[in-house]
């Protein structure tokens, strides 16, 4: 079991993207930073907002890339490379079209599933896809032509409340995730639904 050393929250930078569905991962990391009582600070050399806390004597770094979504890998690779963090010690939180709001699931490895942030991270890590993912359901608009506007839009309050609940569920299995106990984390998280 490899302990998590880096938790990444994907999103787009700038106030026009704040609270959009595509920024669900960034929202998770913001909530995690708040729960740990730490601030996220802009670090130009990592192309993102960075924070750090200690868990059982080990550093855990938080990162929200300030690149656009399709360049997220630039930020992840810069920080992971500097601190020599292997892909299997990275957790990436991101929005997931194929799950309804209120559902959060963990996954290890796999493809990008059409998600541009994941696509770039895989490419920038040298086609290594063994990192872990926290998939935060945002639902699907119904037709592929509507996806771009949907993910870049803000969810109605009822959907946002479901997303917030799924983030709470994910924060509830943080100890298992940090320890690298993915089986236990999945059992606990996947049994919950808002």
UniProtKB/Swiss-Prot annotation:
Site (Discriminates between blocked and unblocked aminoacyl-tRNA) location in chain: 12
Keywords associated with the record: Cytoplasm, Hydrolase, RNA-binding, tRNA-binding
GO biological process, one term: rescue of stalled ribosome
Protein's cellular compartments: Cytoplasm
Protein EC: 3.1.1.29
Gene Ontology molecular function: peptidyl-tRNA hydrolase activity; tRNA binding
Residues annotated for tRNA binding in this entry: 17, 68, 70, 116
Active site: 22
This protein's GO CC annotations: cytoplasm
Swiss-Prot/TrEMBL site (Stabilizes the basic form of H active site to accept a proton) positions: 95
PROSITE patterns given in the database record: PEPT_TRNA_HYDROL_1 (PS01195), PEPT_TRNA_HYDROL_2 (PS01196)
Enzymatic reactions: an N-acyl-L-alpha-aminoacyl-tRNA + H2O = an N-acyl-L-amino acid + a tRNA + H(+)
Top-level taxon in the UniProt lineage: Bacteria
Enzyme class at the top of the EC tree: hydrolase
UniProt record similarity statement: Belongs to the PTH family.
Subunit structure: Monomer.
Function: Hydrolyzes ribosome-free peptidyl-tRNAs (with 1 or more amino acids incorporated), which drop off the ribosome during protein synthesis, or as a result of ribosome stalling.
NCBIfam families xrefs: pth (TIGR00447)
PANTHER family: PEPTIDYL-TRNA HYDROLASE (PTHR17224:SF1)
Protein name: Peptidyl-tRNA hydrolase
Lineage: Bacteria, Pseudomonadati, Pseudomonadota, Gammaproteobacteria, Pseudomonadales
Gene assigned in the entry: pth
